[in-house]
Amino acid sequence: MRIIKQVMLATLMLLSTHSMADSLKVMAYNIMQLSVQDWDQANRAQRLPAALMSLSDSPDVILVSEVFNSDGEQALAALSTLYPYQTPNVGQDCSGSGWDALTGNCSNSPFVIRGGVVVLSKYPIISQKAHVFNNSLSGSWDYMANKGFAYVEIEKNTQRYHLIGTHLQATHDGNTEQEHEVRMGQLSEIQSFIETENIPVNEPVIIGGDMNVEWSKQHEVADMLATAHAELNFKTPAVGSFSAKDNWFTKANAYYFEYSLDYNDTLDYVFWHRDHKQPINAPSMTVRYPKAQNNWYWSYLRGNWNLSDGRYYHDGYYNELSDHYPVQVNLEF
């Protein structure tokens, strides 16, 4: 009987510890709202708020990327009842308006578009700063965008959290080694920023976004985590965050840009900085699969598709919100 009581007491103490723990749920989501070409931007953007607001296990913070147009910004504004604290769009205004600080290589050229990163929070943002990357690959599409990162310090239940949302250099041709080097340079800029901020070591630092690092290339993942001074728990899912095999909108992207219609990998991450306060729950990153409640028509999808398992006729109706699925980590401290 004494042993049973001791076990029960230990269990109650463990449950009490978890109930008292500070927690933060963080999502990274590339919503693919481009400023050029017809990718059904308006229809997807209109349906995004309802899909995010209906999610179970709702994130406290969303690190959003590829908000390159007004449709995307209007969708985020429609989420203000759930996420009343929102940063400006990184690189949209090189004056630094709306930020506590803006650093880096922000271009005022009329040919350069906004960076597309926005942070949404349920909890007050105490400080918000933006940086436009100095590292960028000349000749790539990314070179014509003020891509960088948004830093926020938020407060939830008296605990301060520091978050960085970003979108690293995309792969635009076969020279992945060169693009990987640029991505690591961009992560080094993030690390330099963290060091300069002198963030207390007893406060968490969380980094997330579309890193454009393929989970299947574990040597590149190792480089990413080492450069970012980061920790990550993630098991390969059946459907990754960027899956042409599962997501018909991603399949359309694969067809247009001529890569495998069966492509299935993860490019998006949320990890925590190893030099700051560590989570106590060994959190795992998961891929989430939000979809619109109802299907709608997009003419690009309609027709016969030659798939690996045979010819398939698509009627043009779909309910995907982006070519990426979001990833989420629930952290306890």
For the regions a protein language model found, what residue spans apply to each?
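N-terminal, active-site-proximal structural segment of metallo-dependent hydrolase catalytic domains
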Residues: 17-81, 88-114, 180, 184-191, ...
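Bacterial N-terminal signal peptides that target proteins for export
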Residues: 1-8
